[in-house]
């Protein structure tokens, strides 16, 4: 016995809904790829000259501190970023016009129809515009990232780069820092605040259940795009 067409359509719709629901699981539960091994940056070694007493090298500083100064050294950057921006605009315009056209006269008397002055006109115009806009944004980041010196510039400044990857319950958190620091700005404990990093590039992001919950679905992105007719 064949099933009614309406029942078959309902079963097909229910099956499709279950399949689509399984594709939209909460969080990315796929296994993570293995982390790439960290390759340390090592300063090039200078081969000693045969027969020479002294050879070029990093040297040993007996009385100095242990601050980063050479390629491959480590430096801790303290992230203290706080920005607040706000803007507001208010525009209001209005204009009114009024013009009265007198009725023409014939032999000193206005032309009337049933006692009404039908040729007398009054033109009026009234335009008004009122617009307001407000925007505000606030960002704050605190923490620390240990970076590696990848280049020492001729003026003594250090080009640093590093990242921190935290793998939590259902997601990854990644912090990347790049920039240029001065040797004089490095504290005795080999730290420097992020506010003293030139050409700073600080990126913070993540993926997983928390990051996915903050992202719009494909249908919501369509209705918020320029392609949406509404």
From Swiss-Prot:
- Report the SS bond pairs: none
Cross-referenced InterPro entries? Flag_Lring
Q: Which GO terms describe its cellular component?
A: bacterial-type flagellum basal body, distal rod, L ring; cell outer membrane
Where are lipid groups covalently attached, annotated S-diacylglycerol cysteine? 16
Provide the topology term for how it sits in the membrane. Lipid-anchor
Q: Where located?
A: Cell outer membrane; Bacterial flagellum basal body
Q: Coiled-coil regions in this chain?
A: none
* Gene Ontology biological process terms in this record: bacterial-type flagellum-dependent cell motility
**Which Pfam family, giving just one, matches this sequence?**
FlgH
Q: Where is the lipid attached (N-palmitoyl cysteine)?
A: 16
Q: Which domain of life is it from?
A: Bacteria
Keyword annotations for this protein, in alphabetical order, are: Bacterial flagellum, Cell outer membrane, Lipoprotein, Membrane, Palmitate, Signal
Q: Which stretch is the leader sequence?
A: 1-15
Q: Which GO terms describe its molecular function?
A: cytoskeletal motor activity
Q: Which HAMAP family match?
A: FlgH
Q: Which family does it belong to?
A: Belongs to the FlgH family.
Subunit structure and binding partners:
The basal body constitutes a major portion of the flagellar organelle and consists of four rings (L,P,S, and M) mounted on a central rod.
- What job does the chain carry out? Assembles around the rod to form the L-ring and probably protects the motor/basal body from shearing forces during rotation.
Q: What is this protein called?
A: Flagellar L-ring protein
């Amino acid at each position: 016995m064949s099933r009614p067409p309406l029942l078959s359509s309902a079963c097909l719709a229910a099956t499709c809904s279950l399949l689509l629901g399984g594709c939209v699981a909460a969080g990315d539960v796929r296994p993570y790829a293995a982390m790439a091994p960290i390759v340390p940056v090592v300063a090039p070694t200078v081969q000693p000259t045969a027969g020479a007493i002294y050879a070029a090298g990093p040297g040993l500083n007996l009385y100095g501190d242990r601050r980063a100064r050479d390629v491959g050294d480590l430096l801790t950057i303290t992230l203290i970023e706080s920005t607040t921006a706000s803007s507001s605009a208010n525009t209001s315009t209005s204009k009114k016009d009024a013009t009265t056209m007198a009725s023409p006269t014939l032999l000193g008397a206005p032309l009337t129809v049933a006692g009404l002055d039908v040729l007398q006109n009054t033109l009026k115009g009234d335009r008004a515009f009122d617009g307001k806009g407000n925007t505000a944004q606030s960002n704050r980041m605190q923490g620390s990232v240990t970076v590696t010196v990848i280049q020492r510039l001729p003026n003594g400044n250090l080009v640093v780069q590093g990242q921190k990857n935290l793998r939590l319950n259902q997601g990854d958190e990644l912090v990347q820092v790049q920039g240029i620091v001065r040797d004089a700005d490095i504290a005795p404990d080999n730290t420097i605040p992020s506010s003293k990093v030139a050409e700073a590039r600080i990126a913070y992001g993540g993926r997983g259940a928390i990051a996915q919950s903050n992202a719009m679905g494909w249908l919501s992105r369509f209705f918020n795009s320029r392609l949406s007719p509404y």
